[in-house]
Amino acid sequence: MSALTATIAGIGFWTDGLPDWDAATAFARDGVRPDTAPARPAPQLLAPNERRRAPGSVAVALEVALAACRAADRDPATLPSVFASTHGDLAITDYMCETLATDPTAVSPTKFHNSVHNAAAGYWTIGAGCTEAATAISAFDGTFAQGLL
């Protein structure tokens, strides 16, 4: 069996209070957070209407994917992609289960649209104008490793 090798050409990062890789490395080095950081990323790949409609998990996925492409100087429209999530969007899953159990006719069409596991991959291909292969994967504790494979 031969060893697998990989190269990281670009990194994207986002979490509350640390909106990019530079902020994250500065925090790790100095313990200082930026004075201002957005509460939620605003993925520039999406039109304003789609940006408002996209759930937070999709906004983060698109923000970090685009940042990684920019850091690698790669055009996102030309790249196949893998979006990996341990649980998907739990807030939407919880909403869907509760609403279907209590008042099925009240399900929001937008939330229903975003309840699928491949929502981030779909928004990515539309926003980036990418016609390359896009995959969404979930493997619980093995999600990160499976996403790399």
Task: Give the positions of each predicted feature.
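Conserved "HGTGT" condensation-loop signature of ketosynthase/thiolase-family condensing enzymes
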Residues: 1-135, 142
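A contiguous pocket-lining binding segment that forms or flanks enzyme active sites
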Residues: 145-149
